[in-house]
């Protein structure tokens, strides 16, 4: 039995690939200058002490107004929190060619990430100071393909149920024309959290 050698993958791009009309069509939106709401936002993570000292709605509002940094994943994934009310959160996102899957659409994981973020933050917005939470279940339904040409999308989430130990929320992802792209639901466990 041979030993697997981890050799670097060599990708050869032919002239045919470089001038494929489908490739050019997919990459064309990259040249547009659409921007998210706040391109100068701070990125980072606050200490657990700060996180647990504030109720969820106040903490998330701090991310909106710059008092707290936005989570690093949101920068990596080109998504941004833009609205917070207790039990309701809105994100926007920019699906670009860097998130393409092999068949030329935006990978479903990108849509799942923006939905997960919005649905989880929706639950976070209901937390009391000293409470923590974690996602224990998530379900996503994909309705239409997301493409780089889709442009900036909007993800709206709302709280469905908030108990003392679990909460459920749902989210919907729309294109700029209001067409539904994907929707999902999420269950989070709520627990007393410690600062250490």
How would you describe each model-predicted region?
Residues 2-196:
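Terminal targeting signals and extreme-terminal segments of soluble enzymes
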């Amino acid at each position: 039995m041979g030993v697997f050698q981890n050799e670097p993958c060599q990708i050869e791009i032919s002239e045919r690939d470089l001038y494929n009309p489908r490739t050019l069509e997919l990459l064309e939106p990259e040249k547009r200058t659409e921007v998210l709401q706040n391109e100068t936002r701070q990125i980072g993570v606050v200490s657990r002490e700060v996180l647990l000292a504030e109720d969820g709605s106040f903490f998330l509002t701090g991310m909106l107004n710059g008092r707290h940094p936005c989570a690093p994943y949101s920068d990596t994934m080109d998504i941004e929190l833009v609205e917070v009310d207790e039990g309701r959160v809105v994100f926007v996102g920019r699906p670009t060619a860097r998130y393409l899957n092999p068949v030329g659409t935006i990978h479903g994981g990108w849509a799942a990430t923006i939905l997960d973020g919005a649905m989880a933050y929706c639950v976070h917005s209901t937390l009391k100071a000293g409470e923590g939470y974690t996602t224990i279940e998530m379900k996503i339904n994909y309705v239409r393909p997301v493409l780089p040409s889709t442009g900036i999308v909007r993800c709206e989430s709302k709280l469905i149920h908030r108990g003392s130990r679990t909460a459920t929320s749902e989210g919907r992802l729309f294109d700029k024309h209001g067409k539904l792209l994907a929707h999902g639901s999420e269950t989070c466990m709520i627990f007393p959290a410690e600062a250490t």
